[in-house]
From Swiss-Prot:
This protein's record includes keyword Transferase: no
Tree of life domain: Bacteria
Gene name in the database record: dnaB
Effect in UniProt of substituting R227C: Loss of DNA helicase activity
Record-given protein name: Replicative DNA helicase DnaB
């Protein structure tokens, strides 16, 4: 057992002087001798193939020859000058390497085929030096990037990774063909079967747990979670005792909670079976001392390492783990515990920081090819249940959403339901808030089910709604906060604007106009005429023109029996069973046969650029919206109505594309379909709508009058405001700098939430990152008005790379911590909550998540007085 030494040994020798223009390290004679030996002897091929890869040869011609020899050898065919020449000729490479005579030159060059393995070592060493030169060049580039403003910690970490890759001789590849993976996988399956199904990974020491997991496997991230005092640190040490003391494989614990001596005491207590309390109080018997001395000599050689450095950062853990991987062939890493780690950086919330740790620990597990056990703390969820059993939802920073929750895509601009992503397996780009509160595109790299949990419906003042578990985090100004901790009146972030999608596709404008009119005032039911029925002559004319441009003739009904003038497609003689072109067009967009309460905006509109989105909204508003000036209240009225909630949500989403935040109200109707209205409040957004979107037809006159009125003083509701805590921060900073002017000094002003214009003015005077982000960011601070339980449902979550959040149902939501884990073990001790529990002395390892196998509850005995858990007698 050892303690990690943080001090790297000094380097006595000075670095070599720079010498530019030199050839990279190589030995062409050794390369020729290797290939010549392989052409002469099959045994030489066997000696060489495990030491070299094609990229280890300096000359490209030698790489081609080596690859051809290995291909022939792998197929069981002879590899000599004749067959290799034929293979290279088949590939069109023979002339490139110098023709068949060069192969005979290789044979004549080799002194003896028996030394091919030695020649291969020379080639491998030169290749390693070349990679070191390449890595050094990249490190120099990273250094210059750091001097130009890149994050220094990230630069150092990338430089370390470059050197580590060279030392570990690992060549990164973008992909591996399936055929290259089949045989190694078959070998692993065969090895598991031949060992009777025993653990192939690092054995945990618990028989039943190993039977389910087959041990802890390289590349896995394992979360061990429990409430305080249940024994999660003890379980982590049990894993290490099994790895290092029982099986003599190296392990390391990075402890942010216990000191080195405390950890060693616990290990000795568990191994010598001496009460930890007796050790600490000095009440050990002679028999205890004898057992302790005997076990100390037995475990002193165990390759177990301990690091209790305070304020340990992720970069330090990576650097130390890489060094141990080289020094001691590290097989297991334990981090105790996740919530105590620090990054040294400023994050908008602790939840984001912990999620970053989780992701980096998973990447560390994959990089070093070792299992990483991250100990984590559960929230108070178990204490609120009758049986006190923990659930996956209790994991801190964990949360879930229902299958119907719609995620905003960045590639198409449309929304897609979680359930659809699960069915299709698609992993799209999504819009996400970065640390500056700006919308950025980030990949959703994983979507997964999280079981059945209690779900709450959260409704905002703007009418937006989302269904989530109590543990799902929402963004407050103070940071990411679980839904269970939110209350009515809290302010959370929603997008105030959304950029154009990454892959925009323009639509024919005639089709766009026709589509907007059909959604707003059209009827396209099966076995009924397809009609458009406005009362505005200008709108009728617009549809007539757009239909003509789309090669769709339209005729007008204007007879007395008709309730209103209408346009319908001209009758055409079609074969039986064929629908009209306009019906086929609407069916292709998913709108044919849709009733008014079922309508929605097709994906093609969301893909369109912003100028076409504005055109679509202009004609849609003319068909189903209203724009007017209210002289009684001295303010404008801009709204759109529909019996389809989905259509209202889609229109709200499109308005964000042109930088307009809207509000949704609900009007229940007995005996019919409820209706919804989408309102645009505030002079600023109304002016933006009138200038950038506008309306068509008779409403255009009212729009011009409204725009004229809005240029003067009008009532302007303070809807787009910042949380009060921001206002307090602004006031404190201004007071400290003695910069309060008359506009920012009135006492009554501090009683209310500030409009965004005031922090914007303050931001110009004080240097405060939070105020800057608030004034310039893309977050709208909406108000929680209702939180209601809607029962248990199947729920899902996703992983967003980098920013760890996404837009769902028009609200910014965080993703979960558990998504990075391959295995989640929840620890439960019934007697931790009730000392008289009949199961006293027992503990449950609840395998709540197992990416590569079944879940199960494993019952063990807890002997915490001896700092250990133990298998139950079978």
């Amino acid at each position: 057992m050892a303690v990690v030494d943080d001090l790297a040994p000094g380097m006595d020798s000075s670095p070599p002087s720079e010498d530019y223009g030199r050839q990279p390290p190589q030995d062409l004679a050794a390369e020729q001798s290797v290939l010549g030996g392989m052409l002469l002897s099959k045994d030489a091929i066997a000696d060489v193939l495990e030491r070299l890869r094609p990229g280890d040869f300096y000359r490209p011609a030698h790489q081609n020859v080596y690859d051809a020899i290995l291909d022939l050898y792998g197929r069981g065919e002879p590899a000599d000058a004749v067959t290799v020449a034929a293979e290279l000729d088949r590939r069109g490479l023979l002339r490139r390497i110098g023709g068949a005579p060069y192969l005979h030159t290789l044979i004549s060059t080799v002194p003896t085929a028996a030394n091919a393995g030695y020649y291969a070592s020379i080639v491998a060493e030169k290749a390693l030096l070349r990679r070191l030169v390449e890595a050094g060049t990249r490190v120099v580039q990273y250094g210059y990037a750091g001097a130009e403003g890149a994050d220094v910690a990230e630069v150092v970490d990338r430089a370390q990774a470059e050197i580590y890759d060279v030392a570990d001789r690992r060549l990164s590849e973008d992909f591996v063909a399936l055929e290259d993976l089949l045989q190694p996988t078959m070998d692993e399956i065969d090895a598991i079967a031949s060992s009777g199904g025993l653990a192939r990974g690092v054995a945990t020491g618990f028989t039943e747990l190993d039977e389910v997991t087959n041990g802890l496997h390289p590349g896995q991230m394992v979360i061990v979670a429990a409430r305080p005092g249940v024994g999660k640190s003890t379980l982590g040490l049990d894993f290490m005792r099994s790895c290092s003391i029982r099986h003599r494989m190296a392990s390391v614990i990075f402890s942010l909670e216990m000191s080195k001596s405390e950890i060693v005491m616990r290990l000795l207590s568990a191994e010598a079976k001496i009460k930890l309390s007796d050790m600490r109080s000095g009440r050990m018997s002679d028999d205890d001392w004898t057992r302790l001395a005997r076990r100390m000599s037995e475990i002193s050689e165990a390759p177990l390492f301990i690091d209790d450095s305070p304020n340990l950062t992720m970069m330090e853990i990576r650097a130390k783990a890489r060094r141990l991987r080289q020094k001691a062939n590290l097989k297991l890493i334990v981090v105790d515990y996740l919530q105590l780690m620090t990054s040294g950086k400023k994050y908008e919330s602790r939840q984001v920081e912990v999620s970053e740790f989780s992701r980096h620990l998973k990447l560390l597990a994959k990089e070093l090819e070792v299992p990483v056990v991250a100990i984590s703390q559960l929230n108070r969820g178990p204490e609120q249940r009758t049986d006190k059993k923990p659930m996956l939802a209790d994991l801190r920073e964990s949360g879930c959403l229902t299958a119907s929750t719609r995620i905003l895509r960045a590639d198409t601009g449309a929304e897609v339901a979680f359930g659809e992503l699960m069915r299709s397996g698609e992993r799209p780009m999504v819009w996400s808030l970065d640390e500056r509160l700006r919308m950025v595109a980030r990949p959703m790299i994983n979507v997964f089910p999280s079981g059945r949990k209690e779900v709450f419906r959260l409704r905002l003042a703007s009418g937006r709604e989302v269904e989530a578990t109590g543990s799902h985090p929402f963004m407050k100004f103070e940071g990411w906060t679980p839904l269970a901790q939110l209350k009515v009146g809290d302010r959370i972030a929603a997008p105030r604007r959304v950029p154009e999608p990454i892959d925009t596709q323009r639509m024919p404008e005639s089709e766009l106009i026709s589509l907007a009119r059909m959604i707003g005032d059209g009827s396209c039911l099966k076995n009924q005429p397809i009609r458009y029925e406005p009362v505005d002559e200008a709108n009728l004319a617009a549809v007539t023109v757009s239909a003509a441009h789309s090669d769709r003739a339209a005729i007008r009904d204007d007879y007395l029996a008709a309730r209103v003038p209408s346009l319908r497609p001209a009758r055409q003689r079609l074969p039986r069973g064929r629908c009209t072109p306009i019906a086929a067009w609407l069916a292709g967009l998913g709108l044919f046969t849709k009733r008014s309460h079922e309508k929605c905006v097709p994906e093609a509109v969301f893909r369109a650029p912003n100028d076409q989105v504005a055109l679509f909204l202009r004609h849609l508003w003319s068909a189903g919206g209203s724009v007017r000036w209210d002289p009684t209240n001295g303010q404008g009225r801009v709204y759109y109505g529909s019996t389809s909630r989905r259509l209202i949500d889609d229109v709200a989403q499109l308005l964000l594309r042109v930088g307009i935040f809207s509000w949704i109200t609900h009007a229940p109707k007995l005996g019919g379909h409820d209706s919804w209205r989408l309102h645009i409040h505030g002079a600023k957004d109304q002016v933006r709508f009138l200038r950038h979107v506008g309306v068509h037809g008779a409403e255009a006159v009212a729009a011009q009058e409204m725009l004229r009125q809005l240029k003067g003083p009008v009532r302007n509701p303070n809807l787009d405001s910042a949380p009060k805590k921001v206002w307090a921060q602004v006031r404190n900073r201004l007071s400290a700098k003695q910069m309060m002017d008359i506009q920012l000094h009135e006492p009554t002003m501090w009683k209310h939430s500030p409009s965004r214009s005031r922090p914007h003015r303050a931001e110009a005077r004080i240097e405060d990152r939070a105020i800057h982000e608030l004034a310039r960011g893309d977050a709208y601070w909406d108000t929680v008005v209702e939180i209601t339980s809607i029962g248990d449902q199947h729920v899902f979550d996703g992983t967003v790379s980098g920013t760890h959040n996404f837009v769902a149902n028009g609200i910014s939501l965080h993703n979960s911590l558990e998504q990075d884990a391959d295995v989640v073990i929840l620890l439960h001790r019934p007697d931790a909550f009730d000392r008289d529990d009949p199961r006293g002395g027992e503990a449950d390892f609840i395998l709540a998540k197992h990416r590569n196998g079944p879940t199960k509850t494993v019952t063990v005995a807890h002997q915490l007085h001896l700092s250990r858990f133990a298998n139950m007698a079978r």
